[in-house]
Design a protein with these regions (language model features):
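N-terminal auxiliary segments of SAM/dcSAM-dependent transferases
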Residues: 1-82
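Class I SAM-dependent transferase core
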Residues: 66-115
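Conserved SAM/SAH cofactor-binding pocket of Class I
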Residues: 102-189, 193-197
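Short "lid" loop at the C-terminus of a central beta-strand within the Rossmann-like core
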Residues: 191-192, 209, 234-239
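Glycine-rich S-adenosyl-L-methionine
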Residues: 199-224
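Conserved beta-strand signature within the Rossmann-like core of class I S-adenosyl-L-methionine
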Residues: 226-233
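Short, electropositive alpha-helical surface patch
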Residues: 237-255
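Class I S-adenosyl-L-methionine
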Residues: 249-295
C-alpha cells in the first residue's frame, strides 16, 4: 500500500504540473515577423526566441506567455552560464539541454580515481559537455563525447571551444557508444524512469530506463582490458518507488559488470532542501552515486 501511495503522489504531482501548464498555455501573445513582440513596454525577445527556434519567422504566430517567459529565462541562463569551479570556467546551456545546476555529481566525477594509464574515455549522452570537459581537465588526453540531440551537440562543442578543450574532445552524433573501445566510459543518464511531457524534460526522464540499460548492457563490449565504466545516478527513483531497490544490481549482473567501488554524496540544490516541495518526502532522502564498474 505504501508503494502505491508514494507512486500515486508522484503521478499526482506530475498531473498537477501538466494541468497547470495547460491552463497557463491558454494565455498567448502574438509574435510578429522576425520574432518581434509589439506590446507596450514589451522587452526585446528576438535573441531569446532565436535561441529556441533558430531561423526567424516570416509570419506572425501565437505563443503561450508562459512558454515565452520560460524561453526568456533559459536565454538569460544561457548568457550567464553556470560556474563550474573544477573547470575554472562556466558552462553555457541553451533551452532544451540539461544544465549542470546541481553540481554534486560533478564532485563525484572529480573524486573517483582514474583507471591506470587512462588514454581514452567516452562520455555517453554528453549534453552540455560538462563531464567530457572535467575529464579533459583531469588530464585524459583523448575523449569521445556522444549525443543524439543536435542542440546538445552544438552546445557541447561551443562549451569545449570556449574552455580551450576542443582538441582533447571529439564529439560524435551517435546513439550511446562510438565504434571503438576506451579505458573509461562515463554516463549520467536521466534519473527518473518516467515519460517526459515536453522536450525540456527529455534530459530528466528515461522511459523504461532505456538509456540506463543500453549503457550498462553495452559497456563491457566497449571497454579495454582493465577499463572502467562509471555510472552517475541518483536514488530518487527508488524513494519515489519508480524503481525497485534491487533493480540496479540486477542490471549490473545482466550486463556482466562488477561493482569495484561506490562514491556517494547528498544533493544540496534548492529542491532537496525545500520542505514545502511536493516531493520533499523523497528528495530529503535522495543520495547521488557514482558506481565504478568493471567487466567480469
Amino acid at each position: 500500500a505504501a508503494d502505491a501511495d508514494i507512486q500515486a503522489a508522484f503521478h499526482r504531482h506530475r498531473m498537477q504540473q501538466a494541468q497547470q501548464s495547460r491552463l497557463l498555455n491558454m494565455l498567448a501573445v502574438e509574435i510578429g515577423a522576425g520574432f518581434t513582440l509589439d506590446l507596450p513596454r514589451a522587452p526585446d525577445v528576438r535573441a531569446a526566441l532565436h535561441d529556441v527556434y533558430g531561423q526567424a519567422n516570416d509570419a506572425p504566430f501565437l505563443l503561450p506567455l508562459n512558454q515565452l517567459l520560460g524561453f526568456i529565462g533559459a536565454h538569460e541562463w544561457h548568457k550567464k552560464g553556470v560556474d563550474i569551479p573544477a573547470l575554472g570556467g562556466k558552462i553555457h546551456v541553451p533551452f532544451g539541454v540539461f544544465s549542470p545546476l546541481r553540481g554534486e555529481y560533478l564532485d563525484l566525477l572529480m573524486q573517483a580515481p582514474l583507471p591506470a594509464s587512462c588514454q581514452h574515455a567516452f562520455d555517453i549522452g554528453t549534453g552540455s559537455g560538462v563531464l567530457a570537459a572535467l575529464l579533459a581537465r583531469r588530464g585524459v588526453p583523448h575523449i569521445t563525447a556522444t549525443d543524439t540531440n543536435p542542440r546538445a551537440i552544438a552546445c557541447a562543442r561551443a562549451n569545449l571551444q570556449r574552455l580551450g578543450l576542443e582538441k582533447q574532445v571529439q564529439i560524435e552524433a551517435v546513439d550511446l557508444f562510438p565504434a571503438a573501445r576506451a579505458d573509461l566510459i562515463v554516463c549520467n543518464p536521466p534519473w527518473l524512469p518516467a515519460k517526459p511531457t515536453s522536450a525540456i524534460e527529455a534530459a530528466l526522464y528515461d522511459p523504461g530506463s532505456a538509456m540506463l540499460q543500453g549503457f550498462l548492457n553495452g559497456a563491457a563490449a566497449h571497454l579495454k582490458p582493465g577499463g572502467e565504466a562509471w555510472l552517475i545516478i541518483s536514488d530518487l527513483a527508488e524513494h519515489l518507488h519508480l524503481r525497485a531497490p534491487e533493480f540496479l544490481s540486477q542490471c549490473f549482473q545482466t550486463a556482466s559488470l562488477n561493482v569495484i567501488d561506490i562514491l556517494h554524496t547528498k544533493p544540496q540544490h534548492q529542491k532537496a532542501l525545500n520542505s514545502a516541495d511536493p516531493l520533499a518526502f523523497a528528495r530529503t532522502q535522495e543520495t547521488t552515486y557514482l558506481y565504478r564498474l568493471r567487466a567480469k
